[in-house]
Every structure is written in C-alpha cells, then in structure tokens.
Amino acid sequence: MAITSSISRDAKSRSSILSKNVFRAETSSSNRSGRDVQRIQLHDVRRQATAQSLVPCIVDGLKSERRQSPPLLLWNDRGLSLFDAVLDSPDYYPATREWSLLHNAVRKISYSISSGDRLIELGAGNMKKTALILHTLQAQHKHVQYFACDVDRSALRRCIRELQKLFPAKSSNIKIQGLLGTYEDCAAWLKCNKSNSHTSLMWLGNSMANFTPREASEYIRSFLSSGSSMIIALDGCQDQEQIARSYEGQCNREFVLNGLPHANQLLGTNAFDINDWEFVGRWNSKLWMHESFYVARKDLALTVCGETYHFRMGETIRSIRSGKWPKMKVMEICREAGGKVMDSWMNCEETYGVYLVGKH
C-alpha cells in the first residue's frame, strides 16, 4: 500500500502483548490442486496486536487538544480497495510521476543494492513498482532477500503470493518473505536480527510524508541506527491547486470517510455515524503538508469507551497527512536524523524524487 502508519508510543507502553525482543515466524502452504505451491514465510514481528492497540489510539486522539484519528483506520480491506481507486484517478498525479521516475531510473537505483543484501519494503505496496525493481535486480544477477513489511496480514500474504509467482524460489535469485508489524516493529526486529549482509529499506509512494518532518526524521534515525540504508520516494510538488485536485476528489473522500465505520467496528459501537461527518482537505504551510479532516455537520456528543466527547458543528478530527517536500526539505529532514542524501534521482520538473539515504 502507499501509506502505512504506526502505533503511538503511549498506546504501546499501555498495551504491549509481546515482549520487545520476541518475534515469531510462521510458514504456510496450500496444495489443494495437487500442484507444488511455495510456502509463505511470514515473520510476526509485532510487539502488540494492531487491532487492540488502535482502540487506545482512537481514545487518545479524541482527548488531544487537536483532535485526530489514527491513520491506520484507513487501511482495512475496504480501505485498500478504495485506495486503489485513488491511485487510478486521473487527478492523482503522485502515482504517475513516481512510476515514470522509477521506470526511467530503476537501473541506477538498483545499483545501490548489492548481491546478498536484504531488501525490506515498508508497506506491502504496489506490486507493479516492486516487481519492476526486483526484475531489475534479477537482471543484474543479484541474489537478494526481499521482505515486504505491513500491518495487514491478508494484504501481506497476497503480496507475497503474487511476488512468488513472479519469482519462483527454485529458479529465482530473489527470495520472498514477509514481516507482519508496524514500522517501529520492523526497526526493533532489525536491531535484534542483525545480518552479515547489508540491509536496504525501501519506502515508496510518498509514504514517509504521512508523518510530520520531525516524525519522519525520527523514523530515519531509527532505521539508520541498525546500519541500514534507505531508498525513499517523495513528492515535492508545490502547486497547491494540483495538490487539492489530487487529494480532495470523490475517491479520496470515500477513502478517508471509510475510517469512521472501521473505528466503529473496532470499538464495538456505532459512535461515529458517517452521515454526521463531512470530508475536507487543507494545506498546512508550516509543515509543507496536505491534511485531511472529518468535519462535524452538526453539534455532536460521541460516547467512546464510557466517555462522552462533544463537537460543535464545523469542528474537526484530523485523519491523514501527506507532505510535499522538495529536495532541500528532504535533505534537511535527513540531516536532523543524523543521515545524509547520498544520491538522488529526480523527474524532469524536479517535483518528484527518489533518495538514497545513509548515515552521516
């Protein structure tokens, strides 16, 4: 998926289910047709159960001074389907710009990954982009262990199955596995599972920019501390009219509003009536980010986990953000993380970039 969010640190400390350094692996296979089917190797690196941890995140967001909801609410099965419609929308320029850039620069980008490396993709995302990069690595005769990391088990398994069809274990240099967990879980797993091989983390789809610049720096710092390098794709568009068309259309409206019934499902109550809320998008010039909000259509009183929260008509709950960071901003974010941009590949207009980031 293009966007994968994480769990708040406060929620983690309250509801940790697995100890920090315990990770589990599972393998499964299906052979109902009698054919030889590859096993799916999936490492459960979660330090807490995602669904259970989202409930305190919802409550924390309602209690905060600037009310917000966890972006992970958007990524249930229906949300994944709705986001596919966003990607296919003619107004959604990030998808076409990123694909064009990757297609043109994939060989150069792939040279930053050596034979024997571990390649971890943050977010079990767009198979078209992933397959392009893995096919290029295979054409360069490189042996690579690829891991897709995601919080959604079913999406992760689908991703692994599709890639195993393209890269069969018996005939391919590319070995496919999965990591089930958040970005923080992945960083913890890396620190506990150090390899003699170098690890490259791939973060495509402008997903890093779902976090504020400060949060993005913290993630980069965490991943670089394990000795890894990062390949990060980021949108640097500054045309606010184009951004609004891309992020405030009907497809995005349906995608964001889907977070409300998902919240109800997790809470076990109909606290959020989707008819009581509207979607609106706004540009935050201080953070260089587009932000999506739920806006109350009328005065509301919501009861969640035994507490009542009041909203006046027009009051908002922030849902998801998308940063638009040009190269100079990306370099600043990396410096704050103790890293540096070692190489970069830009489209002709320099409105979209892929950055190779390492420790300074």
Regions found by a protein language model. Name each.
Residues 66-111:
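Class I SAM-dependent methyltransferase Rossmann-like catalytic core
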Residues 2-73:
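N-terminal auxiliary segments of SAM/dcSAM-dependent transferases
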Residues 116-125:
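Conserved class I S-adenosyl-L-methionine
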Residues 127-131:
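Glycine-rich SAM-binding Motif I of class I
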Residues 136-185:
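Class I SAM-dependent methyltransferase SAM/SAH-binding core
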Residues 242-337:
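Substrate-binding/catalytic lobe of Class I Rossmann-like enzymes that use SAM or dcSAM, i.e.
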Residues 226-239:
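Conserved beta-strand signature within the Rossmann-like core of class I S-adenosyl-L-methionine
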Residues 209-226:
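A short, conserved alpha-helix within the catalytic core of class I
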